[in-house]
């Protein structure tokens, strides 16, 4: 219901503003949210997390492009570099049950949230390895 209302221009700005105030007041801005086929541990005060919660998707064009490429090349593994809350990894794990995913993010808070997401989605978590460090071509 909220995801549909958030597409109406007036509510698009009103819902996040009101929600942030309410959640701050009750100190309940973090928790598990059902995002289509899986649960994610998200923080409503984080702008990316908030977009995922309200729209039930994130970067739809990029995700579709990536899914098409993985399908075309019949990929066996996927490197999610800068995984943040794990949305890309979770979507890929759902779409490609046979693929192995290696997710990297140097941010401890992002890894904490992604780790909580993996705990809640045990079947999916078997395909994903999460690492709390960044990858770069520089030392």
Across the structure, where does each feature detected by a protein language model lie?
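Phosphate/nucleotide-binding beta-alpha loop and adjacent structural elements of enzyme active sites
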Residues: 1-139
């Amino acid at each position: 219901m909220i995801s549909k209302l958030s597409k109406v221009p007036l509510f698009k700005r009103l819902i996040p503003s009101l929600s942030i105030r309410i959640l701050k007041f009750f100190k309940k801005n973090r928790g598990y949210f059902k995002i289509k086929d899986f649960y994610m541990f998200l923080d409503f005060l984080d702008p990316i997390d908030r977009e995922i919660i309200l729209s039930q998707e994130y970067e739809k064009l990029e995700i579709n492009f990536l899914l098409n490429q993985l399908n075309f090349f019949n990929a066996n593994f996927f490197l999610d570099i800068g995984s943040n809350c794990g949305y890309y990894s979770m979507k890929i794990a759902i779409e490609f049950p046979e693929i192995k995913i290696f997710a990297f993010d140097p941010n401890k808070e992002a890894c904490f949230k992604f780790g909580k997401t993996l705990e809640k989605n045990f079947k999916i978590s078997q395909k994903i390895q999460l690492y709390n460090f960044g990858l770069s071509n520089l030392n």
